[in-house]
Amino acid sequence: MAKKVDGYIKLQVAAGAANPSPPVGPALGQKGVNIMEFCKAFNARTEKFEKGMPIPVVITVYSDRSFTFETKTPPASFLLLKAAGLKSGSGRPNTEKVGTIKRSAVQEIAETKAADMTGADIEAMTRSIEGTARSMGLVVED
Protein backbone atom coordinates (compact mmCIF):
# COMPACT_ATOMS: atom_id res chain seq x y z
CA MET A 1 0.00 0.00 0.00
CA ALA A 2 1.28 3.46 -0.89
CA LYS A 3 2.06 6.01 1.80
CA LYS A 4 -0.39 8.86 2.31
CA VAL A 5 1.03 12.20 1.14
CA ASP A 6 0.78 14.87 3.84
CA GLY A 7 2.00 17.76 1.69
CA TYR A 8 4.56 19.25 -0.65
CA ILE A 9 7.22 21.83 0.17
CA LYS A 10 8.87 23.85 -2.61
CA LEU A 11 12.16 25.58 -1.80
CA GLN A 12 15.19 27.04 -3.53
CA VAL A 13 18.34 26.03 -1.69
CA ALA A 14 21.97 26.74 -2.56
CA ALA A 15 23.75 23.60 -3.80
CA GLY A 16 25.75 21.94 -1.05
CA ALA A 17 24.65 24.54 1.50
CA ALA A 18 21.42 23.19 3.00
CA ASN A 19 21.36 23.75 6.76
CA PRO A 20 18.67 23.97 9.47
CA SER A 21 18.53 27.77 9.36
CA PRO A 22 15.74 29.57 7.44
CA PRO A 23 14.25 28.90 4.93
CA VAL A 24 14.89 25.14 5.23
CA GLY A 25 14.41 24.60 8.97
CA PRO A 26 11.05 26.33 9.49
CA ALA A 27 9.55 24.92 6.28
CA LEU A 28 10.44 21.33 7.18
CA GLY A 29 9.87 21.75 10.91
CA GLN A 30 6.20 22.65 10.53
CA LYS A 31 5.62 19.35 8.70
CA GLY A 32 7.59 17.36 11.30
CA VAL A 33 10.35 16.27 8.92
CA ASN A 34 13.83 15.38 10.22
CA ILE A 35 15.67 18.52 9.11
CA MET A 36 19.23 17.20 9.41
CA GLU A 37 18.37 14.07 7.43
CA PHE A 38 17.09 16.25 4.57
CA CYS A 39 20.11 18.57 4.73
CA LYS A 40 22.60 15.68 4.52
CA ALA A 41 20.72 13.99 1.66
CA PHE A 42 20.30 17.27 -0.28
CA ASN A 43 23.96 18.26 0.11
CA ALA A 44 25.06 14.79 -1.04
CA ARG A 45 22.79 14.91 -4.10
CA THR A 46 23.88 18.44 -5.11
CA GLU A 47 27.65 17.86 -4.85
CA LYS A 48 27.92 17.80 -8.66
CA PHE A 49 26.59 21.37 -8.95
CA GLU A 50 28.67 24.50 -8.48
CA LYS A 51 28.65 25.41 -4.77
CA GLY A 52 26.13 28.15 -4.04
CA MET A 53 24.07 27.61 -7.22
CA PRO A 54 20.35 27.91 -6.35
CA ILE A 55 18.63 24.55 -6.83
CA PRO A 56 14.82 24.31 -6.74
CA VAL A 57 13.66 21.29 -4.76
CA VAL A 58 10.20 19.75 -4.27
CA ILE A 59 9.90 17.78 -1.03
CA THR A 60 7.05 15.29 -0.69
CA VAL A 61 6.14 14.75 2.97
CA TYR A 62 4.23 11.61 3.96
CA SER A 63 1.87 11.14 6.91
CA ASP A 64 4.49 9.05 8.79
CA ARG A 65 6.88 12.08 8.62
CA SER A 66 9.11 10.42 6.04
CA PHE A 67 9.94 12.33 2.88
CA THR A 68 11.30 12.13 -0.64
CA PHE A 69 12.62 15.02 -2.68
CA GLU A 70 13.26 15.88 -6.29
CA THR A 71 15.83 18.44 -7.39
CA LYS A 72 15.19 20.53 -10.49
CA THR A 73 17.57 22.41 -12.78
CA PRO A 74 18.77 25.87 -11.67
CA PRO A 75 16.55 28.85 -12.59
CA ALA A 76 16.93 30.18 -16.14
CA SER A 77 17.67 33.67 -14.80
CA PHE A 78 20.66 32.36 -12.81
CA LEU A 79 22.01 30.45 -15.81
CA LEU A 80 21.59 33.51 -18.07
CA LEU A 81 23.42 35.81 -15.65
CA LYS A 82 26.21 33.26 -15.26
CA ALA A 83 26.56 32.90 -19.06
CA ALA A 84 26.63 36.69 -19.50
CA GLY A 85 29.10 37.13 -16.62
CA LEU A 86 26.82 39.49 -14.67
CA LYS A 87 25.80 39.77 -11.02
CA SER A 88 22.23 40.98 -11.61
CA GLY A 89 19.82 41.96 -14.35
CA SER A 90 18.54 45.41 -15.24
CA GLY A 91 16.11 47.27 -13.01
CA ARG A 92 14.61 48.81 -16.16
CA PRO A 93 15.02 46.14 -18.88
CA ASN A 94 13.18 48.01 -21.65
CA THR A 95 15.36 51.11 -21.44
CA GLU A 96 18.57 49.99 -19.76
CA LYS A 97 20.46 47.01 -21.24
CA VAL A 98 23.10 45.45 -18.98
CA GLY A 99 24.80 42.96 -21.29
CA THR A 100 24.66 40.61 -24.24
CA ILE A 101 24.40 36.87 -24.62
CA LYS A 102 24.94 34.65 -27.67
CA ARG A 103 22.03 32.70 -29.13
CA SER A 104 24.15 29.53 -28.87
CA ALA A 105 24.42 30.05 -25.09
CA VAL A 106 20.64 30.52 -24.88
CA GLN A 107 20.18 27.28 -26.86
CA GLU A 108 22.50 25.48 -24.39
CA ILE A 109 20.49 26.79 -21.43
CA ALA A 110 17.23 25.67 -23.10
CA GLU A 111 18.68 22.17 -23.53
CA THR A 112 19.71 22.14 -19.86
CA LYS A 113 16.23 23.26 -18.78
CA ALA A 114 14.40 20.89 -21.19
CA ALA A 115 13.81 18.29 -18.45
CA ASP A 116 11.86 20.77 -16.30
CA MET A 117 10.14 22.82 -19.00
CA THR A 118 6.91 21.80 -20.65
CA GLY A 119 7.41 22.79 -24.25
CA ALA A 120 6.65 21.36 -27.64
CA ASP A 121 10.20 21.46 -28.95
CA ILE A 122 13.65 22.87 -28.28
CA GLU A 123 13.03 25.92 -30.51
CA ALA A 124 10.00 26.93 -28.43
CA MET A 125 11.99 26.48 -25.23
CA THR A 126 14.83 28.55 -26.70
CA ARG A 127 12.40 31.37 -27.51
CA SER A 128 11.07 31.21 -23.95
CA ILE A 129 14.61 31.53 -22.53
CA GLU A 130 15.28 34.43 -24.96
CA GLY A 131 12.20 36.17 -23.54
CA THR A 132 13.55 35.69 -20.04
CA ALA A 133 16.88 37.17 -21.15
CA ARG A 134 15.17 40.23 -22.67
CA SER A 135 13.11 40.76 -19.51
CA MET A 136 16.38 40.87 -17.55
CA GLY A 137 17.90 43.54 -19.79
CA LEU A 138 20.10 41.20 -21.84
CA VAL A 139 20.45 41.54 -25.62
CA VAL A 140 20.40 38.22 -27.51
CA GLU A 141 22.92 38.20 -30.39
CA ASP A 142 23.43 35.67 -33.19
UniProtKB/Swiss-Prot annotation:
Keyword field: Methylation, Ribonucleoprotein, Ribosomal protein, RNA-binding, rRNA-binding
InterPro entries in the record: Ribosomal_uL11, Ribosomal_uL11_bac-typ, Ribosomal_uL11_C, Ribosomal_uL11_C_sf, Ribosomal_uL11_CS, Ribosomal_uL11_N, Ribosomal_uL11_N_sf
PTM comment: One or more lysine residues are methylated.
The keyword Signal belongs to this UniProt entry's keyword annotation: no
Pfam families per UniProt: Ribosomal_L11, Ribosomal_L11_N
One of the protein's GO biological processes: translation
Gene Ontology cellular-component terms listed: cytosolic large ribosomal subunit
Disulphide bond pairs: none
CDD domains: Ribosomal_L11 (cd00349)
GO molecular function: large ribosomal subunit rRNA binding; structural constituent of ribosome
Lineage top rank: taxon: Bacteria
Entry-linked PROSITE patterns: RIBOSOMAL_L11
Role of this protein: Forms part of the ribosomal stalk which helps the ribosome interact with GTP-bound translation factors.
Similarity annotation: Belongs to the universal ribosomal protein uL11 family.
Quaternary structure annotation from Swiss-Prot or TrEMBL: Part of the ribosomal stalk of the 50S ribosomal subunit. Interacts with L10 and the large rRNA to form the base of the stalk. L10 forms an elongated spine to which L12 dimers bind in a sequential fashion forming a multimeric L10(L12)X complex.
Protein name, as recorded: Large ribosomal subunit protein uL11
Organism: Shewanella pealeana (strain ATCC 700345 / ANG-SQ1)
